[in-house]
Amino acid sequence: MSKEFSRTQRVSQQLQKELAVMLQREVRDSRIGMVTISDVEVSRDLAYAKVFVTFFCVGEQTPESSLAALKEHEPSLRMMLGKRIRLRLTPEIRFTYDNTLVEGMRMSNLVTDVVNTDKRKMAESGRTESDEGEE
């Protein structure tokens, strides 16, 4: 009988939960700001964990500066993880900025702009959307 999830998937889910709690409650660094863990990818041998993060930056903060500050905490977070999760080897954490949210919003704005431009051009030419379908 096969398992519903592989061990790496279960470990990555657990790491995501634990890291989210630790970043929210235990890491006190104003340079990081609000951070969200969007995904965790664990290597097959469970030695490395690639943690994808997004930031809500305020004021002078940039995703790059927040990521640099977060990377300074990698060793201490790994040590805390080792105490919380029972694994033979605690994965080495590598934080990576996840720009999919920003890119998704950019793409959505582009589509909205194109739709609005099409509507404006149709209105200027005196045609309606129902006329477009009859051709």
UniProtKB/Swiss-Prot annotation:
Subcellular location per the Swiss-Prot or TrEMBL entry: Cytoplasm
Gene Ontology cellular component list: cytosol
Annotated keywords: Cytoplasm, Ribosome biogenesis
GO-annotated molecular function: ribosomal small subunit binding
Gene Ontology biological process: maturation of SSU-rRNA
HAMAP family, A to Z: RbfA
Membership in a protein family: Belongs to the RbfA family.
Assembly information from the UniProt record: Monomer. Binds 30S ribosomal subunits, but not 50S ribosomal subunits or 70S ribosomes.
Protein name: Ribosome-binding factor A
Organism expressing this protein natively: Aliivibrio fischeri (strain ATCC 700601 / ES114) (Vibrio fischeri)
